[in-house]
């Protein structure tokens, strides 16, 4: 149970983060629309391609998968606009201090794997951010998260959720919360062909961290998905 001062600190932090996302929302939208109107970065084509890559039927993926994904990979998903300026700032600071840390949202990760664009350049990153911004305005955020989960790489011979269903020998709707946590943790630490003791320990720590986050935010099970369904 969180102490009152911890709750207050979290509330203040959330207010600040919400304000930062609101401040950056419109500049990103303006830039994305201007770039698209000028035909730069092939934004229109990229957005349409990403939309067409989203399957029509994603109901077979339980909402719990999305909830765990949001908590572990993109906990500000309810307040950002497809790009998380807070995470970007944190990633820049971490890079300066030689501690690499990701700042990509679920929308950005979906754009990246859909377009198969992994160039380590500023232009690629900007193109990805602008595409994610426009995509989040066109598509249901929960559907984007499920489409990402369906296409994501989870390790050797584990491309997409259907491969995981075969591996676990059960449907997604029959999987336990512990199994969903393990699957989500594989997004950061994909299953290698041969797993070393060090990699196994990192994977287990990741699972423990996700479970801790779920324990601290018990309302995630339904609330996150319900709100994501209407976010734009």
Please provide the spans of the model-predicted regions:
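Juxtamembrane regions of bacterial inner-membrane/periplasmic proteins
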Residues: 1-232
